[in-house]
């Protein structure tokens, strides 16, 4: 990964100019070739639920995907790494990845998702996401095996307070942004990393990658965010001037429910994380006030920095 490539597809449909490729387009050609080429490595090796300890002691959980030989042994070569930090639990990404590996199932599912159109309904904002599926959206949301089998490592991390990670969900806030920088630094220092990190993701994971780039961590060399946003009212709640109140409650409910799904493997192994449970019970339905704030706060940053005061101001 070289240079800084930013492809922004915003929810409003307005394209944001990408940063020019300093190689004159050579990097884009190389990226496409790597993503679309036949697999260079026959297998993918996965390290499940690898702990990453943040500076405040909170432990986040990550799955690490690396190219492997026919026996399933990961290659020894240090590789560029693609990072995705998600609030939707790695378990969902694993499920999507597994479905895509079933012969004869992936294509019909992708076609169905791409055909969904919620225009004119309270769920209008979802349409942009479903239409991105046909262009490789699921690989960006979950695991991109094409990249892994062609010489990249991929790290998928449960954001603080979601999935199997400890802590309280700090939606796109200062602590979560600091976590992103620390995860990037941790990734760059692993033996399987060549020290260069890129980020990709859709929607929430697109926004946190843009935020991470703004912090300019030394190891972050590129981001590819699909469907990020900044103004919740214009991008989600009132897209095009039509008020749609269905998405935000559904989204908050989804994340708040998914964060209670436990790590079954750790339970079976007698290694259940009791702090994880304590953190969930302490904040069972976080960010309900932010749902109301979405109608008045100018930007996502306002809600993240001033979650309980933006309406009053």
Feature map (PLM): residue ranges:
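Short beta-strand element of the alpha/beta-hydrolase
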Residues: 63, 73-87, 198
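Alpha/beta-hydrolase active-site loop
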Residues: 135-143, 149, 171-191
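Alpha/beta-hydrolase fold nucleophile elbow
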Residues: 191-204
